[in-house]
Amino acid sequence: FFSYQLNWMYWRYFMWNFAGRQNDLQGSGEIEHGNWITGIKFIDNMLVGNQDLLPKELKENKGHNVFYCLPLLLGIIGLLWQAYRGQKGIQQFWVVFFLFFMTGIAIVLYLNQTPSQPRERDYAYAGSFYAFAIWIGMGVAGIIRLLQHYAKMKELPAAAIVSVACLFVPIQMASQTWDDHDRSGRYVARDFGQNYLMSLQETGNPIIYTNGDNDTFPLWYNQETEGFRTDARTCNLSYLQTDWYIDQMKRPAYDSPSLPITWDRMEYVEGTNEYVPVRPEYKKSIDALYAEAEKQALSGNTEALVNVKKEFGENPYELKNILKYWIRSKNEDLKVIPTDSIVMKVDKEAVRRSGMMIPGDSIPDYMHISLKGKRALYKSELMMLEMLAEANWERPIYIAVSVGPENQLNMGNHFIQEGLTYRFTPFDTDKLGVKIDSEKMYDNLMHKFKFGGIDKPGIYIDENAMLSLIHISEP
């Protein structure tokens, strides 16, 4: 609590604003990333070591800001001056203090943050920093009163001298932070959002799966505000676990038809099908059941075979049958996935019409989806399987390159990259050794993609913008 939640996740952010910041790189406790500093060399050496030994790119990072603790000192002076101004002063002090506490440390207690946050959380405590800024303003008044009391100066000269002297504090802060807050000429979020959408096939009302904020909100902005690629549908996998979002996905939006989800609402409402266990151990019993039924059929008794196929389908491990007879079964005992290797029959004509690249010289009869290592599939993953089965290669389905393997349903071996997206295909692209549609990739990179002005000298490239570039340079 004290070392991480208070020190690292609150006081570090506090000191960024009133003492100084090492750089704008997200830190996880490293001595060279995201610490607070002062600009006073001997203090910084004690805090984070000799900063002169850092590599050039860290020393010249635009997020390197030093305030020499001047705002901090002014705030402490203002805090003390307010608290020791008699009864009225202490009453005012407690008002500001509780504003400071309730928007700062109280939020730390409430959030109970775990390690390895996906991003810096300084924005959560902005109210606390505003409260401290009140004390900074009072610090100026406090110094004026001190000069009047101890130096016997008149109010006007004291106010003039202190105001001019303290004016250097915001000037210093502005001069340090201007370059890493200047977004002029930079359109990375908008352009990279368009790049994701431009990576999609131009026909067929494509679907793109996203997962985080940075690969979702720019797409929504472009579609909803700029009217760009409104024929495509952005589907956030984080939200796809909820019934209200599935409701939205089942409705048309702009020029995009609804997503291919046939489930009734009662099948995905909150509390229903939140997850379905993967039980490959069932396979042995099912195989034995089919073998016995086929054996009886050879003897002329086809009733058992007809019944078992009526219960579980022609192939009990085929995707549509698993969805129909197992996952969506009314029998709670059958709400499992009885294999860790699902097969999906491939409509070859649909694949030929789809517009996807066809590596090799043939289209497989079946696509194999491995669930090895998975103990269950969650609602969002079930929806992905449902859409894959219902789309039948007639509606292109993509996943953003920024989505991690843990959210790819173990289907990375079926992806072909066409830009900033991977396209779902029926091919085992790992075995074929073809992971990129080079023609579409080249066309996207050289003729369609925009880069938000980051090619211009002096444009501020923060960590998020750099990560967007990495997704292009290191697919």
Task: Describe the role of every protein-language-model region.
Residues 1-125, 132-205, 217-469, 473-475:
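ER/secretory pathway lumenal C-terminal domains and tails of membrane proteins involved
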